[in-house]
């Protein structure tokens, strides 16, 4: 009986926690987050359909053309589902160049709302389905950028300063058919000049110093391994010499089938 009560209580507690977790973060995004200032001005004048600038703090700024009155922002969870993309510093630019904040989007009958699966941005009154641009800031992970292709078209991703992707072990870009270039400040731009048809854009990059650290580790491992091999060979040579001095090692012909030495 006690076990049944404990099991029932545990199930109720799990249900309560699960229900609470599922409801966390749903609803309209707060005005403080929507209207916060981005770390740097958005790249409104880009000639790409989507332009992403990755910051050194792993956050990234995105500007993308709108081709629908509603945009769903999400991340794939690896289990066939999605999670809402957490956004801040939301801005919308009308085709005439007027820029409004996220709270102004809401005040003009639009919305920026988070559900359990995605963040929904509905364009404000007077915004055409295409021709405008949506900008927002979100968070990522160190040395890796992955984002679904929310809009069809060309893409450009700017890496943080001093980041590279040339070394195959540490650098990787997907999908292919891209090109890279460096701007006047030395930052690497990854460009898909042709419309991207893949579901996700993914870039793995590294700091320049990572190569030096990797090279140092390889050299250290090589030195330790070489030293260990040398020590092992020396010990074997010493053991062989001692056996010879003690008369244990006696060379015999391969064809000699007689008794061992000392028993003849």
Please tell me what each predicted stretch does.
Residues 50-54, 104-115, 174-183:
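Short, exposed beta-strand/loop patches in secreted or surface proteins that constitute
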Residues 1-85, 254-263:
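N-terminal pre-first-transmembrane soluble regions of secretory-pathway and organelle membrane proteins
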């Amino acid at each position: 009986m006690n076990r049944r009560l404990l099991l029932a209580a545990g199930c109720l507690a799990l249900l309560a926690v699960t229900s609470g977790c599922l409801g966390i973060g749903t609803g309209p995004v707060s005005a403080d987050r929507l209207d916060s200032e981005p770390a740097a001005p958005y790249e409104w004048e880009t000639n790409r359909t989507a332009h992403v600038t990755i910051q050194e703090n792993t956050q990234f700024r995105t500007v993308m053309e709108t081709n629908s009155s509603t945009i769903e922002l999400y991340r794939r969870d690896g289990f066939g589902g999605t999670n809402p993309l957490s956004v801040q510093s939301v801005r919308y630019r009308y085709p005439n160049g007027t820029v409004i904040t996220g709270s102004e989007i809401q005040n003009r009958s639009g919305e920026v709302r988070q559900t359990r699966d995605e963040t929904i941005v509905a364009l404000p009154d007077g915004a055409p389905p295409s021709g405008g641009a949506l900008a927002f800031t979100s968070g990522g992970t160190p040395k890796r950028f992955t984002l679904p292709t929310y809009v069809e078209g060309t893409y450009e991703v700017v890496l943080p300063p001093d980041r590279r992707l040339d070394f195959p072990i540490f650098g990787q870009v997907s999908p292919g058919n891209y090109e890279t270039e460096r701007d006047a400040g030395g930052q690497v731009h990854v460009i898909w000049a042709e419309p991207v048809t893949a579901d996700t854009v993914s870039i793995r990059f590294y700091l320049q110093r990572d190569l030096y650290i990797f090279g140092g580790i390889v050299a250290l491992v090589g030195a330790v391994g070489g030293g260990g091999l040398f020590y092992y060979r020396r010990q074997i040579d010493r053991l062989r010499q001692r056996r010879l001095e003690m008369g244990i090692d006696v060379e015999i012909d391969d064809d000699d089938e007689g008794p061992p030495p000392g028993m003849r």
